[in-house]
Swiss-Prot record:
Gene3D superfamilies: Ribosomal protein S20. This is Small ribosomal subunit protein bS20. InterPro entries: Ribosomal_bS20, Ribosomal_bS20_sf. GO terms for cellular component: small ribosomal subunit. Belongs to the bacterial ribosomal protein bS20 family. The keyword Ribosomal protein applies. It comes from the Bacteria. HAMAP family: Ribosomal_bS20. SUPFAM superfamilies: Ribosomal protein S20. Keywords: Ribonucleoprotein, Ribosomal protein, RNA-binding, rRNA-binding. One of its GO terms (molecular function) is structural constituent of ribosome. It comes from Granulibacter bethesdensis (strain ATCC BAA-1260 / CGDNIH1). GO terms for biological process: translation.
Length: 89
């Protein structure tokens, strides 16, 4: 248990930040799931629109340090490639 006032304050801050980061991560996952379902349905325009909405959410999460920026870049790249493959198929 924290003995000093500053340690107790840090614990409070960590709790708030953890909740905030969990909410950001959950929101990002929701947007990615919308892209995944649009890809699975085979609808190219819906998938493209869903990706356009998901991209800023993912980049915002990276900017806030919730997930690494390279992880966001990789995931966006893979989603974009799948949507492009959907257009040619």
């Amino acid at each position: 248990m924290a003995n000093t006032a500053s340690a107790r304050k840090r614990i409070r801050q960590i709790k708030v930040r953890t909740e905030r980061n969990a909410a950001r991560k959950s929101r990002m996952r929701t947007f990615v799931k919308k892209v995944e379902t649009a890809i699975a349905s085979g609808n190219h325009t819906a998938a493209n629109e869903a990706l356009r909405e998901a991209q800023p959410e993912m980049q915002r999460a990276a900017g806030k340090g919730v997930i690494h920026r390279n992880t966001v870049a990789r995931r966006l790249s893979r989603l974009t490639a799948r949507i492009k493959a959907l257009a040619t198929a």
